[in-house]
C-alpha cells in the first residue's frame, strides 16, 4: 500500500493507494501551521489509523511546498512555519519505525501526471505549474529527478532570457522575487505574474479569470496583454526545453485552464528552438487537486 500526503499551508490531504494505484482511503484535516509537535502527531495519527483500517503498513510519501536541505535533511519552507528548519522526515521515521520520503509538491504533481496511464510509456515528463507561482518537476523513467541539492525543477528561480525581456517592451518591469533576486521568471509566468503584468501596463488590478474573459470578448487591452504574455512564455519555455529536452510537458495550475495556451504555445515555441528540435507534446494535467497526494504516494514506487 502506498500512502501519500499533500501538506499545504492550510490543509493536509491524505490518500492511500493499492498496488493497482487505485485510491482506497482519503482524509483531510487542517494543517497545524505553528505547532510542530502537533504537525508530527497529526501525520502519525493518520498513518496509524490507515494501518489499522487497511491491515498493513503503507509506504509513506509526503509532498510539501518546499524541500529538504540536501546537507542535513531539514525542511526549507515558508508556507508551514512550524516545519521550517525542522527534521520532519527523521522525526516521523523515529515515531513510525519505517522509511518516509519527502519531496517538493511540484515534483509530486509531475510524478502524478507521469504515472497516468496515458503517459506511462513516456521516457521523460516535465510538469509545469502556472498557478500562484511558477515551478515544475522532471520525471525520468517514472522517478523524480531532484538533483544534487534537491532544487532541480525550481525553474521559477531562473532568470528571464534576454529576448523574453525584450518582448515586454520598453516599459518592462523588473520585479524583485521572494528569493531576493531580480528577474526570476516566477514573477512573470505565474498566474500572479499574469495579473501583475496587466496591472503594470494598464493600471488596473484584475484577476486572471477576468482578463481571460475580456480577451474572449476581443477587448483591446486584454488581447494585447495575452499576446505579449504568450510570446514571453513561449520564449521562456523554449529556453527550458532546450536545456531539458522533455518528451512530454504537462501544464497545471490556474492558468493551465486557458485553452488558448495549447493552440498558441506549440507554434510560438517552435520559432525559438534549435532548428533540429521538435516541440514536445504539451497537455493539460488530468488529476487536478488530487495530483499532490497521488504523486507523494508514488514517490515510493519502484518501476
UniProtKB/Swiss-Prot annotation:
HAMAP family: GlcNAc_kinase (MF_01271). Keywords: ATP-binding, Carbohydrate metabolism, Kinase, Metal-binding, Nucleotide-binding, Transferase, Zinc. Its EC number is 2.7.1.59. Catalyzes the phosphorylation of N-acetyl-D-glucosamine (GlcNAc) derived from cell-wall degradation, yielding GlcNAc-6-P. Belongs to the ROK (NagC/XylR) family. NagK subfamily. ATP binds at residues 4-11, 133-140. It is an enzyme of class 2 (transferase). Pfam families: ROK. This is N-acetyl-D-glucosamine kinase. Zn(2+) binds at residues 157, 177, 179, 184. Signal peptide: none annotated. It comes from Photobacterium profundum (strain SS9). One of its GO terms (biological process) is peptidoglycan turnover. NCBIfam families: PRK13310.1. InterPro entries: ATPase_NBD, N-acetyl-D-glucosamine_kinase, ROK, ROK_cs. GO terms for molecular function: ATP binding; N-acetylglucosamine kinase activity; zinc ion binding. It catalyses: N-acetyl-D-glucosamine + ATP = N-acetyl-D-glucosamine 6-phosphate + ADP + H(+). Pathway: Cell wall biogenesis; peptidoglycan recycling. PANTHER family: N-ACETYL-D-GLUCOSAMINE KINASE, ROK (REPRESSOR, ORF, KINASE) FAMILY.
